[in-house]
Amino acid sequence: MAVLTHGSPTPSGAHFDGKGINFTLFSAHAEQVTLCLFDEQGQERQIAMPARTGDIWHGYLPGGKPGQRYGYRVSGPFEPSRGHRFNPHKLLIDPRTRALEGKVGDDPRFTGGVSQPDVRDSAAALPKCLVIHEEYDWQGDKPPAIPWGNTVIYEAHVRGLTQLHPDIPPELRGTYAALAHPALIEHLKTLGITTLELLPVQFHIDEPRLQKMGLSNYWGYNVLAPFAVDPDYASGREGISPLRELRDAVKALHNAGIEVILDVVFNHSAELDVFGPTLCQRGIDNASYYWLTPDGEYDNITGCGNALRLSHPYVTQWVIDCLNYWRDSCHVDGFRFDLGTVLGRTPAFDQHAPLFAALAADERLSACKLIAEPWDIGLGGYQLGNFPTGFSEWNDQYRDAMRGFWLRGEVPRGTFAQHFAASSSLFEQRGRLPSASINQITAHDGFTLLDLLCFNQKHNQMNGEENRDGSDNNHSNNFGCEGLVADAAIWQRRKACQRALLTTLLLSQGTPMLLAGDEQGHSQQGNNNAYCQNNILTWLDWGSADRALMTFTADLIRLRQQIPALTQDQWWQSGDSNVQWLDSQGQALSDAAWEQGCQQQLQILLSQRWLVLINATDHECEMHLPEGEWEGIPPFGVSDHAERLTTWRGSAHTICVLIKRD
């Protein structure tokens, strides 16, 4: 018969110390916490937690070993109007569990009750927490520590990136192990990628709505257990756990000089709205973990049914501990925060919010690359440029300006230039560096680059919402034909814009982020919200990749790394050697001239040597070059037997880079 001694309120979670397991659980409003232990046959033993220190319930299991399955039942008031939804009929997952065994199906037993507690027991349906204790030999692994000025981010999904790669063994495709495969690493190295940003690898579940339609949450933003590695991306090889496989991947990428950033989800939980499943925080301490309205309803500022109350002292520490766990146990180099405005809500957004202060005070985490998606859907949710020093931010204004300039003719060159210069008006006055602007043309959320040039309308019928989901504001241009089938003239214009947008992205000041597959010409058939498409729609088709475009992209990244104005991470100042803005005649643009003449033509001289020529019009143009001898460089020309140029004739929707001869 298992007996719990008092144990200790620290460390948090379930920890094996060599002689037993110490269990802790936070709940400020519970009346009783019961530890539930499960054997291999699923038989449950319930033991009341014997001690409480402050709001931490704790107990120690002598003789407990790694592999122990467990969960919790928490008793207390069921008073929804006051935010309390305790229900001991529901087995609950430890918010700090580092592994889970099983899956969460669409099961009515997870219902906690809306106005009255649901009395159906959920233990048989709920995955069990696992106590793990895994040593790992990092073999001297060190972070690549890529300076921000040299950083080129590649946003990718573990499965989407590797599932169809022909040079990766079939049994490893779509897994963490595939990330460590030499063929994948060679692609990243050849391309010039410095930093791999992975969509969520935290343990996530599929929403009941998707399960009913036979779909899944492919992107993985419906996180249940943020400390746990998602086993769906593990190869399942004998003796190799998901955690070890991910560690192996990070180590291999580090050995190749590539950083790893994880996309993490702390804005909401997988419990969704009041009608969603009771799996974890709702039953542990609903009033502490979630933002609630005065009448106890969920304040749905995320659009996902709930929002985590990250300003609560314990919840703040929960996030900090989780980030440190990933940093320490998996050696990751940084984090991208989904719907990052929630991090700073108190409930209004505050640069000095408790979580921001805790991140800044943590020497290990503050040294990581921290990236925010600077919005949520709540009041005051759009916060681009307002995050504290130490954060970089996804820049949707850059995205829309570059799309509008090249594809719609709607953006004047002054606006283009402002965003080409790392959106200085957003970041410089707030004491941030250019690298704070994470420049992107596309991301996982939206059209791929190719689809941006082939579709004026979204085509999301496969998502099962009658094409209502996904953005209608895409700033795209199909050049007169909806879809991938078009005549040669249309494809010529599309490919010109494809290269122009890639060039703009990779030669802008700030931190470029390339969506995996854009360098290959990947299409999602016009689906701009493929979050639930775990199939060939989202998996990169390596067999049909545009090899010439891949070479073009690699040449661009190499070119970027040669230009000091782009790598030194300092703001460009008027009159300095970093940048000169010129008109089509090669003359410096005065303040008045910015608003005159053709608004889709421009020359940009970088570091007094590299000349970027831009013709975003729909017709050919001729530009007079500034004084000096100019020649083409890869990927825009061949340096051998180079022609010395004094003028440049550019086709429609064209960008070119020349270098000044010494």
UniProtKB/Swiss-Prot annotation:
Pathway(s) per entry: Glycan degradation; glycogen degradation
Molecular function terms, GO-annotated: glycogen debranching enzyme activity; hydrolase activity, hydrolyzing O-glycosyl compounds
Residues the record marks as active site: 338, 373
Keyword annotations of the record: Carbohydrate metabolism, Glycogen metabolism, Glycosidase, Hydrolase
InterPro entries recorded: GlgX_C, GlgX_Isoamylase_N_E_set, Glyco_hydro_13_cat_dom, Glyco_hydro_13_N, Glyco_hydro_b, Glycogen_debranch_bac, Glycogen_debranch_GlgX, Glycoside_hydrolase_SF
HAMAP family for this protein: GlgX
Family to which the UniProt record says this protein belongs: Belongs to the glycosyl hydrolase 13 family.
Protein name: Glycogen debranching enzyme
Source organism of this protein record: Yersinia pestis bv. Antiqua (strain Angola)
